Amino acid sequence: MRGWTAAVAMAVVLVGTVAGAFPVQVPVGAQGEAPDVAALRAQLAEKDAQLKQALAKLQMYEDEADFNRAEQMGIAEAVRASGLPERQQRRLAVAIVREAERNNIDPLLVVALIRCESSFNNYAVSGVGAMGLMQVMPDTGKYLADKAGYKLGRHTNLFDFETNVNLGTAYLADLISRFGSVEGALVAYNAGPGLAKRILAKKENRVKFMAGYPAKVVKEFRKLKAQQERAVSLRAEQPTVGRKG
């Protein structure tokens, strides 16, 4: 028993010695701060809050500008006809315009593709597993998200319409660049790049396939463009009518 007591006593001495040599780190603020440090910390917190408010306001202005363009292009009108919840329509119209402009493609082509792929059903799943508005395959979505610098996470995240439009539009733009035309890209979007190369390599297969899915999307796109042009013409005539009245 005396041996244990001596050992404990020695341990206490050693711990005390080590503690003296290496002081315990006390959390910041526990010992109090110099007034100037505390004041600086408060200023930084205030500036951080102001920055967050400014960024939120900037995002609001950008969203408003994108939605105005969506109205002018006929995107908002097409989305309103989708049957989606009203609270989603504005955000989707903004997402389509923003992602299309980011990828340098016509926003109405994105709308046409969504109509043909999912009929604006956020939760559409094809027989082969393509998901969401633009029917993005999970593996393709993961690859595109990694390429864009973020993680897709669960494949069900493809049901998020903004994520789906972000990835689907980037994929369409990539295919247009790789295949050299919208029609060729649509073949690849529908059949996959590997099979698309084989389809496009043979005239008979190419003509037959082009008459299906690509023709359907292009027809929808042209219909949307015609509606857009009529709307632009009507807006151009309105000031003249107003002056005559």
Feature-to-residue mapping (PLM):
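Bacterial N-terminal signal peptides that target proteins for export
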Residues: 1-9
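Sterically constrained small-residue positions within well-ordered secondary structures
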Residues: 11-12, 127
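Acidic, low-complexity intrinsically disordered segments
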Residues: 14-46
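Intrinsically disordered, low-complexity polar segments enriched in Ser/Thr/Pro and acidic
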Residues: 21-31, 48-51, 234-243
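Heptad-repeat positions
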Residues: 37, 44, 48-51, 55-58, ...
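Catalytic glycan-binding domains that act on GlcNAc-containing polysaccharides
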Residues: 58-245
